[in-house]
């Protein structure tokens, strides 16, 4: 995990630059890190962006105490998993990492709302789309079975066209990362989840 060290050290300094004690943690890979409008989009919920480039779900577990553990969040939203699959991990392995991350959250923060954003479709990783879909189905089923304050945010379906192929306007020209229009969509979908599930965290 040493290759993440520079990014992790950068995130360790974020807390000192915030004018508030964060209540909503966004944690995960570059899809979180590159969400440039995140603080503006969800500012009333006192967010902190703890995304780091190339992060896997396994890395999110590894660095959880070091990064998320320095805060006292009232809710956590996670996006990770596609890099695990891109590295050759099997869907079942990714689901195990998800369970481990849930355990980290529960052990440290109790039964706070924890949401997992589905792995997005991408043109670059279309060759592993079956694994992406299967991983999403495994994690969605896991969340449904556990219930409670565990939630699944489905962005996958909204990012595909009628044929099931990724909609290009939601992706950068590299076919992998999210475009500004894509983040507008994420703001809408994630915002709907927040409004219906954890709206009481809005700053008074």
Name each model feature, range by range:
Residues 95-117, 134-150:
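Charged, glycine-enriched surface loops/patches
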Residues 79, 117-118:
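Alpha/beta-hydrolase-fold catalytic nucleophile elbow
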Residues 124-204:
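Catalytic His-Asp segment of secreted/periplasmic serine-dependent ester chemistry enzymes
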Residues 16-17, 38-40, 106, 167-168, ...:
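Short secondary-structure boundary/capping segments
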Residues 2-100, 123-133:
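Conserved SGNH/GDSL esterase-like catalytic core that processes O-acyl groups on lipids
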Residues 50, 117, 153-156:
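Conserved beta-strand termini and adjacent loop/short-helix elements that scaffold enzyme active sites
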Residues 19, 70-71, 109, 146, ...:
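Glycine-rich phosphate-binding loop signature in dinucleotide/nucleotide-binding domains
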């Amino acid at each position: 995990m040493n290759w993440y060290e520079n990014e992790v050290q950068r995130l360790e300094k974020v807390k000192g630059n915030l004018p508030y004690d964060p209540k909503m943690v966004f944690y995960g890979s570059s899809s979180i890190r590159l969400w440039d409008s995140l603080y503006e989009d969800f500012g009333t919920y006192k967010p902190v962006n703890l995304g780091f480039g190339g992060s896997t779900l396994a890395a999110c577990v590894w660095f959880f105490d070091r990064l998320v553990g320095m805060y006292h969040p009232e809710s956590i939203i996670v996006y990770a998993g596609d890099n695990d699959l891109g590295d050759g991990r099997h869907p079942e392995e990714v689901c195990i990492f998800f369970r481990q991350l849930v355990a980290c959250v529960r052990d440290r923060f109790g039964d706070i709302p924890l949401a997992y954003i589905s792995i997005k479709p991408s043109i670059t990783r279309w060759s592993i789309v079956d694994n992406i879909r299967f991983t999403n189905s495994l994690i969605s089923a896991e969340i449904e079975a556990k219930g409670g304050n565990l939630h699944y945010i489905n962005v996958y379906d909204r990012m595909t066209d009628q044929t099931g192929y990724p909609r290009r306007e939601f992706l950068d020209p590299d076919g992998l990362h999210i475009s500004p229009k894509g983040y507008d969509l994420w703001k809408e979908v994630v915002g709907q989840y927040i409004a219906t599930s954890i709206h009481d965290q809005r700053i008074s």
